[in-house]
């Protein structure tokens, strides 16, 4: 199975377990691995046979920024569901990093990774 990788997409969203944490937008970083058959795209050199990266980015941005979330797990699930609505994509891995989650503890980020198909 082939894959397309979108790595390091940054969005500002209201996310956090407490109401206070959700009061101010926070930076999150999203990686997505999209598994699909790319043989027709590679043999024809035709964009119509692949996935438009900008559309996937816009989808992730809309999901992340238009709703409030308590958990990055929920956000990851919603992004995966949105991506899988494209019938060409057979499997997706979504990683979400929350850099400020443990910043006071000198931790680079907290993260979640889910795989859906």
List where the protein language model places each region.
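N-terminal, polar/charged subdomain of small-to-medium soluble alpha/beta proteins
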Residues: 1-117
């Amino acid at each position: 199975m082939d894959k397309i990788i979108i790595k390091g997409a940054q969005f500002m969203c209201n996310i956090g377990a407490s109401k206070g944490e959700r009061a101010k937008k926070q930076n999150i970083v999203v990686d997505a691995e999209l598994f699909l058959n790319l043989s027709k795209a590679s043999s024809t050199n035709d964009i119509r046979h692949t996935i438009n990266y900008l559309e996937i980015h816009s989808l992730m941005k809309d999901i992340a920024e238009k709703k409030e979330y308590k958990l990055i797990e929920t956000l990851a699930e919603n992004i995966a569901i949105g991506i899988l609505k494209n019938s060409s994509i057979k499997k997706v891995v979504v990683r979400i990093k929350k850099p400020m989650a443990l910043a006071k503890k000198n931790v680079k980020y907290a993260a979640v990774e889910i795989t859906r198909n």
